[in-house]
């Protein structure tokens, strides 16, 4: 999934230049407030988008941020390994080397003692590296759609020697990939293209959704995030529901909500990198039995996009769709630039200037 500019992105760039020229000519210099609501099911990448705004539109992560994320990286790493270890039993997978059972006990003990946010001891690090290298663990990892596993598990476990080093400091990418469940509403402020943005990240799990209603007033646009890679997975909070089906249901209720009759909806079909890898091995018919196409990235992604767009029951509402990879700063920068231009164009249209 390279980052060369697509035709869509080139067109967005041209549009961007034209809009900026129009703004200058019309002398519209007063910065406007833009209220963006970031919605989507749990683990769709909303909080990662917020972190990207910090990198792109603020000054990135401070020394204090790095310090705060360090224990989260330790926890995400060992908790991911512990989840695979637990699944070994559930799925009945054997270790490649029976000696690994001792290592797995050590990992699970650390987690059960709630010491998962601590730096790894030399002994624990060795045990974790041996486990991650075990053929049984790898077989179990390859079946991760059958249990709940953090998307960043492989990223962190492949970096064990770096994360386990005594002088370890989280990199920007390490921080972008951290997973902490969002509870409540997180608000971020930044200025871009003469607009004051207020971005609201709202918890995606079902229990969090009742808190969204307070944010609904005067929303300029909604960014709705979907994890493309969730098509063959079930929810954390309800293991009978497919993640993609849940996203579609939620999108339907947001898109056709009376509060949002005149609100622009921007659809981020996210985790395109994970989806591109997964679609080679896991057919889309798992989620959409009626899917007639091939299991290529292009065909499958286009089909999913159509499924979401078809939920829109308003003939006057346009859904602006982007394929995204929230952990890729360049991709999010280009996409957010295009999103901002849509907002500016809609604002100007509202004033009769565009």
Swiss-Prot record:
InterPro entries hit by this protein: Gprotein_alpha_I, Gprotein_alpha_su, GproteinA_insert, P-loop_NTPase
All copies of the G-alpha domain together span 32-354
- Where Mg(2+) binds, per the record, is at 47, 182
Q: Which UniProt keywords apply?
A: Cell membrane, GTP-binding, Hydrolase, Lipoprotein, Magnesium, Membrane, Metal-binding, Myristate, Nucleotide-binding, Palmitate, Transducer
Q: Which domain of life is it from?
A: Eukaryota
G2 motif: annotated span: 174-182
Residues bearing the modification 5-glutamyl histamine: 205
Q: Which organism is it from?
A: Mus musculus (Mouse)
Region (G4 motif) residue spans: 266-273
Where does lipidation (N-myristoyl glycine) occur on this chain?
2
Reaction catalyzed: GTP + H2O = GDP + phosphate + H(+)
Supply the name of the protein. Guanine nucleotide-binding protein G(o) subunit alpha
Stretches the record annotates as G3 motif: 197-206
In this UniProt entry, which residues carry a covalently attached lipid of the kind S-palmitoyl cysteine? 3, 351
Quaternary form? G proteins are composed of 3 units; alpha, beta and gamma. The alpha chain contains the guanine nucleotide binding site. Forms a complex with GNB1 and GNG3. Interacts with RGS14. Interacts with RGS16. Interacts with RGS19. Interacts (when palmitoylated) with ADGRG3.
Which amino acid positions bind GTP, per UniProt? Answer: 43, 46-48, 152, 176-179, 270, 273, 325
The family note in this entry says: Belongs to the G-alpha family. G(i/o/t/z) subfamily.
Which stretch is the leader sequence?
Answer: none
């Amino acid at each position: 999934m390279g980052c060369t500019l697509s035709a869509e992105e080139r067109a967005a760039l041209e549009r961007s230049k034209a809009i900026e020229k129009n703004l200058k000519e019309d002398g519209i210099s007063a910065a406007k407030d833009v209220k963006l609501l970031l919605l989507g099911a749990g683990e769709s990448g909303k909080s990662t988008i917020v972190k990207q705004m910090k990198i792109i539109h603020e000054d990135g992560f401070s020394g204090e941020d790095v310090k705060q994320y360090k224990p989260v990286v330790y926890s995400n790493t060992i908790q991911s390994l512990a989840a695979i270890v637990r699944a070994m039993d559930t799925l009945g997978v054997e270790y490649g080397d029976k000696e690994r059972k001792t290592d797995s006990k050590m990992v699970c003990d650390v987690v059960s003692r709630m010491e998962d946010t601590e730096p790894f001891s030399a002994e624990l690090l060795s045990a974790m590296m041996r486990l991650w290298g075990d053929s049984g663990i790898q077989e179990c990892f390859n079946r991760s759609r059958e249990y709940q596993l953090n998307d960043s598990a492989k990223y962190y476990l492949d970096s064990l020697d770096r994360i386990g080093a005594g002088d370890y400091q989280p990199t920007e990418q390490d921080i972008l990939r951290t997973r902490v469940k969002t509870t409540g509403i997180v608000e971020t402020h930044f200025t871009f293209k003469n607009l004051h943005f207020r971005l609201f990240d709202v918890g995606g799990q079902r229990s969090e959704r009742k808190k969204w209603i307070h944010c609904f007033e005067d929303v300029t646009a909604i960014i709705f995030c979907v994890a493309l890679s969730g098509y063959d997975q079930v929810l954390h909070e309800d293991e009978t529901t497919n993640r993609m089906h849940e996203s579609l249901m939620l999108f339907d209720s947001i898109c056709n909500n009376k509060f949002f009759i005149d609100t622009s909806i921007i659809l981020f079909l996210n985790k395109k990198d994970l989806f591109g890898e997964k679609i080679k091995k896991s057919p889309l018919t798992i989620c959409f039995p009626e899917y007639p196409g091939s299991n290529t990235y292009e065909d499958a992604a286009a089909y999913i996009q159509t499924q979401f767009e078809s939920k829109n029951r308003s003939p006057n509402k346009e859904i602006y769709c982007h394929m995204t990879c929230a952990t890729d700063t360049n991709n999010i920068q280009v996409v957010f630039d295009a999103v901002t231009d849509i907002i500016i164009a809609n604002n100007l249209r509202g004033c009769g200037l565009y």
